[in-house]
Amino acid sequence: MATKAVCVLKGDGPVQGTIHFEAKGDTVVVTGSITGLTEGDHGFHVHQFGDNTQGCTSAGPHFNPLSKKHGGPKDEERHVGDLGNVTADKNGVAVVDIVDSLISLSGEYSIIGRTMVVHEKPDDLGRGGNEESTKTGNAGSRLACGVIGIAK
């Protein structure tokens, strides 16, 4: 059973980063940094597929094995892959420090082999009042992504 994972984020533009995942008890601690962002919040999600053959678009929708509507990371109604937002400072750097109790590095909610994506816009956490909000959080285009792999 994997206890650690890593993801290298890359895109067509300046956005890049490295994200680390570590299983701790019933949670996964997600840490790292992303550079090249515009200042402010950016949606941060695990997507269904580990397929980046056509850039980030081939990663599919948010990882959602429970067939729920999109929500925030603390909501009961959320996709497993909904990790909310990361916030970039005025220098375009987002420091990631998330503890989540729904994603896993093993079993049916495992994120290993799936794609981590950072988005162009803030995630409205499913509260945007339209259909797209309940699917994507209106987070916009995919700036950078990478497949989550087992780490030592």
Swiss-Prot record:
Cofactor(s), names only, from the UniProt record: Cu cation; Zn(2+)
Primary localization: cytoplasm
Modification sites for Phosphoserine: 101, 104, 106
PTM annotation (N-acetylalanine): residues: 2
Broad enzyme group: oxidoreductase
Residues modified to N6-succinyllysine: 4, 10, 90, 121, 135
Enzyme nomenclature, EC number: 1.15.1.1
Keywords for the protein's UniProt record, in alphabetical order: Acetylation, Antioxidant, Copper, Cytoplasm, Disulfide bond, Lipoprotein, Metal-binding, Nucleus, Oxidoreductase, Palmitate, Phosphoprotein, Zinc
Cited function: Destroys radicals which are normally produced within the cells and which are toxic to biological systems.
PANTHER family: SUPEROXIDE DISMUTASE CU-ZN -RELATED
Protein name as annotated: Superoxide dismutase [Cu-Zn]
Species annotation: Bos mutus grunniens (Wild yak)
